[in-house]
Design a protein with these regions (language model features):
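Catalytic Walker B motif of ABC-type/P-loop ATPase nucleotide-binding domains
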Residues: 165-168
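Conserved ABC transporter NBD signature motif
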Residues: 62-73, 81
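Conserved ABC ATPase "signature" region
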Residues: 117-135
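The feature captures the beta-strand-to-loop junction immediately N-terminal to the Walker
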Residues: 39-41
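Conserved ABC ATPase signature
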Residues: 140-144, 148
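Helix-to-loop junction immediately C-terminal to a conserved catalytic motif
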Residues: 54
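Conserved catalytic motifs of ABC-family nucleotide-binding domains
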Residues: 161
């Protein structure tokens, strides 16, 4: 399950007065089974970089492959890619949207084709795995503390059983 970037460049708002070069000629290979950390200053492009891993952002130039296939190839199944390469956003508010926690965590598995009942099994396992208490499953995710929101966001991705898990600032705002 390797991810490889070759000469990846990304520019926000190209050709405008707001043009920003976020990534320039990035070459990176992440072999199967590896744990890696990407560090850098605020605004250095870390979040932009990882959003390329599951095709949330298309590079301005360069290629990205997953298991040897170009993820921007004409016939490539990016929906399947996003099921295999799970991304937890830096800010959980960018990820949470349902009326209650359990429904929010069920969204991904249901989007993958599971029934509501099957999705609930996966969601409950994921929520328990991140230490989220069952008594809070019916709460609105927007009523939770920052740390609880982060746990729900992580559970939402874990419930999809991705082969690769990408965490953007995973410990920021976690409650003890």
């Amino acid at each position: 399950m390797s991810i490889e970037l070759k000469n990846v460049t990304y520019t926000y708002s190209p050709g405008t007065a707001y043009e920003i070069h976020a990534l320039k000629d990035i070459n990176l290979s992440i072999p199967d089974g590896q744990f890696i950390g990407i560090i850098g200053h605020t605004g250095s492009g870390k979040s932009t970089l990882i959003q390329h891993f599951n095709a949330l952002i298309r590079p301005t130039s360069g290629t990205i492959t997953y298991n040897g296939e170009d993820i921007w190839g004409e016939k490539y199944d990016r929906r399947a890619l996003r099921s295999e390469v799970g991304l937890v956003f830096q800010y959980p508010e960018h990820q949470l949207f349902e009326n209650d926690v359990l429904s929010d965590v069920c969204f991904g598995p249901m989007n993958q084709g599971l029934s509501r009942e099957e999705a609930e099994v996966e969601a409950k396992k994921a929520l328990q795995h991140v230490g989220f208490k069952e008594k809070n499953f019916s709460k609105s995710p927007f009523e939770l503390s920052g740390g609880q929101k982060k746990r729900v966001a992580i559970a939402g991705v874990l419930a999809m059983n991705p082969k690769i898990l990408i965490l953007d600032e995973p410990t920021a705002g976690l409650d003890p």
